[in-house]
Amino acid sequence: YKDIQTGVRQEVVFGGKYRKGYSIMPSLDYRKRDFFVRGLDVVLTANYNKNMTNNVDTSSYEYNWRGEMRPLRMPGEQSYQNTRSDNNNWNGTLTANYRIGKAHTFTFNHVINAFRRSNQSLLNEDSEANAIPKETRKNISGLSYRLMPTEHWNLSVFGKYYNQFIAGPVATSSAQDDYIRTTNSVSAMGYGAAGTYFILKSLQAKLSYEKAYRLPTNEEMFGDEDLETGDISLRPENSDNVNLNLSYNETFGKHSVYVEGGLIYRNTKDYIQRNISDLSGGKYGATYVNHGRVETKGYNISVRYGFANWVSVGGNFTQMNVRDNVKTVTSGTNQESLTYGARMPNLPYQFANSDVTFYWRNLWKKGNTLSVTYDNLYMHSFPLYSEAVGSESEFVVPTQFSHNLTLSYGIQNGRYNISFECRNLTNEKLYDNFSLQKAGRAFYGKVRVYFGN
């Protein structure tokens, strides 16, 4: 059960809108070394997720942040509904590694996902749209070869095949009172290569290139039947990705040091972007569109230090320069887009985190460990809308700096574990990428029992 407090914008407040449901998810994991033949290792995983979501928006009042309310002309704070959505999600993966001698490894990987959603209105007669289920099937197959003649270097080449089938209702009239079932299927080939080389014993370089595709998610295609509206005509993102990394890892007696730095370049086409749209009457919704081209240049730095299995401290800093790379307003014209070269909105571009953990091993009894962890996250302010539109100071998600504290006690080498966590320790004002305020200080407790050997 979850109360829906806000819409997709902070100024939209709900007082009687809620969502409830349940989920069942059995899973299977199978692993076998030397499967039928020596050198062939197989891993098979599968899970089934059946969940029901009931979106209820039947209030006859509208609210403000002070809790005050006034009658609505028509019931429904966002859109009058009491809708049940039954979602069935099947996932499976197969990974097979075949080693030939010490230098050659072939890997085959296949991921399959099947999704089906059926909707039912609990208020009145179902619409034609609800009579048509929303379905998708994804298949991603990959084959790679790795050459590792020595411990000093290795080289990998790989190919991937992507396929996605989509089916769902589409309106045939502007009044959206008549629907038909439409289907679409897309497929693509991805590929790439990666290599690593030890310049020194503790200094490693990594270089990779990939022609990659990202298939639209279920929410991007079908929405959430409430505040999000999907688009089944979305095209997959495709990008050229280049990564260069240098890492240093060394141990000096009881001291360990790890340092890594990386450069990132991505040239993305058909970038899938979430937008906030005005539905009139002070109501807003989220939609998804393909944005022609986006270019990303960035770097990240990670550092970690450990001492005698007693303390671990580290941090990470990332700078991502994600820019609109669409030059003209429409294809085939010379009119330059106002947002060309501007930073893409709703994306943090400078952020950092750090943490420190202390361990007390064999505390009170051998095999028991007490750990205390402090971590934080810094996020620089970033545009809420395109920098080319409006005042930069007015339309930004503000800078944020949050702190967390976790206490964990493991018993019998981790078979039993008790943990307590305080998120947002100093009760800072935190926001998501669309400036929706997150929860304040919160406390959590968790007990875990491992039943394996």
Predicted region positions:
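Face-selective signature of the C-terminal outer-membrane beta-barrel domain
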Residues: 1-2, 14-175, 180-181, 187-188, ...
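Extracellular loop and loop/strand-boundary signature of outer-membrane beta-barrel proteins
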Residues: 9-18, 76-83, 123-132, 144, ...
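Conserved C-terminal beta-signal and adjacent last beta-strands/turns
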Residues: 19, 207, 235-244, 308, ...
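Outer-membrane beta-barrel translocator domains and adjoining extracellular loop/strand segments
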Residues: 1-14, 54-63, 68-69, 118-126, ...
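Membrane-embedded beta-barrel scaffold of Gram-negative outer-membrane proteins
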Residues: 198, 204-210, 236-297, 318
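Hydrophobic, lipid-facing positions within transmembrane beta-strands of outer-membrane proteins
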Residues: 22-28, 88-94, 137-143, 161, ...
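Gram-negative outer-membrane beta-barrel transporters
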Residues: 259, 264-267, 287-383
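Outer-membrane beta-barrel channels and translocator barrels
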Residues: 33-37, 99-103, 148-154, 198-202, ...
